Structures are given as C-alpha cells and as structure tokens.
Amino acid sequence: MEVVIVPDAKAGGELIAESIAALWRRKPDALLGVATGSTPIPIYDALTAKVAAGDVDVSSARVCQLDEYVGLPAGHPESYRATVIRQVVEPLGLGPDSFIGPDGSAEDVQAACEAYDLALASAGGVDLQILGIGTDGHIGFNEPCSSLASRTRIKTLTEQTRVDNARFFDDDIDQVPHHVITQGIGTILEARHLVLLATGEGKAEAVAQTVEGPVAAVVPASALQLHQHATVVVDEAAASKLKLAPYFRHTFANKPVWQGL
C-alpha cells in the first residue's frame, strides 16, 4: 500500500486524474470504477479539464459504478446512476455504451447483483477503481463486519451512513434508502489498481485504522492492505492521525517519476 499526503483536496484530485489519464493513454478502453459522494468531485473536475484541453482521448473509455441505492424510482436525481451520468459521463463526453452499472430497481435484486459481477468480468475487469471511505471505515457500502471475500450483494445501511448521506436528500434522513447494491470487498479487490481518496479531519481516524491498523472486517477499508497495487491519497487533515506520516512523505518525495501512482 502506498500512502500519498497532499496539501488539499484539489491537489489530490489532480494527482489521481493524471493517473487515470495516463491509464487511458496506455489503454484507451480501460474500465474506470467510479465512486460517488462529494470526495471524488475534484478528481472528476480535473479529469474533465484534461479532456477539454485535449490531454487525453476518452472516445473508447469506459466507466462502471461501485454501488446503487435499492428502490429509488427510475431517474431519481440522487440514484447513483444519475449521479455518475451527471458528474462523470456527461462532463467527459462519454458515449451511452461506455457505462456499466447495477440495476437497483430490479424486482429480483439478488439476480441483479450476480448479473453485475458477471458484467464486470465480461468487460475484462476494472482497471482502476476510485474509492472513498466512510467515517466508520466502509468502502462502497461494505459496512463494518462485511466479509472480506464478499461479492456484489444487497446491504442494509447503518444509521450513521444514512445520516452522512442525508445531505444529498435535502437533509431529510427519511428520504435516504435503507438498502443498496454494492460491489463486495472481494469484488473490489479484483480491480487492478485501487485508489482511495480521503479528505478532511472527519476521515482521519478511519484512515489511520485503514493504513496502520490490523486487517479486520470491522474496518472494511483495511482490506486494501491485501491488494498488490493500492494507493491511499489523503490531505493533511485526513492524515493528521497517521503515526508514519513523515515516512509516507519521504517515500513519495523520493519516488521515481516514471512509476506514477
């Protein structure tokens, strides 16, 4: 696991966006796994700017969702499909066939979960997966004590996660669904490169447990320690509880440029 400490969210977004752009230059049809929420927006903003400037060709690029609410009406503006289209697909100018996501409105949710795992495998797997992290250490919607070998499945959200997400529903927690389809931790770990971005002091404890604590289901993000190519990008506030912060700064400052993230 590599830990990169950046000054702020904008710097983290630019760093990750350049890694994604480099991936698409090497492999034009690479599959990018995208996360939702406010944290990854600087990544998408920086990536959109690169596309607009002609720094990267995305005509063959593909994206896929990490998760989806269950039971929201089709076209609901806060469904993750609508969010990804709004934040990523449309700004980048991607085509309608570039986007893969689970069906949160399916009558048979279990079948939809299994179908999504098959769709990811049929697409050749995820090349780079963007991740956020919850205040309780969740990734995707794999809440504490999720199996580290779990596959895409339906999960019940914790009340803390519903409280955290109420800001997207007019601060009305009653509008926040109780269930989601999420890639499992085992599914997430199959991506070739995992990049987790965390910003703000509120994420500091979760980051410290993820990076410096033991691998444990109670901190789902700690499973990144088991991945052969995992990168954790944090701003100064989110890094504030890392005991090894000086070491992480030193190693990144002396990393060969050609290695990238």
What is each of the regions a protein language model found here?
Residues 56-130, 246, 251-260:
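Ligand-binding beta-strand-loop-alpha-helix segment within the catalytic cores
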Residues 136, 140-185:
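Class I SAM-dependent methyltransferase SAM-binding "motif I" and its flanking Rossmann-like core
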Residues 46-57, 80-82, 144-154, 213:
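A glycine- and small-aliphatic-rich helix-loop capping segment at beta-alpha/alpha-beta transitions
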Residues 29-30, 38-39, 43, 119-144:
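A glycine-rich beta-strand to alpha-helix segment
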Residues 1-32, 49:
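N-terminal glycine-/serine-/threonine-rich phosphate-binding loop
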Residues 186, 190-261:
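ATP/nucleoside-binding phosphotransfer catalytic cores, i.e., glycine-rich phosphate-binding loops
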Residues 111-113, 140-146, 150-152, 206-210, ...:
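A short secondary-structure junction signal
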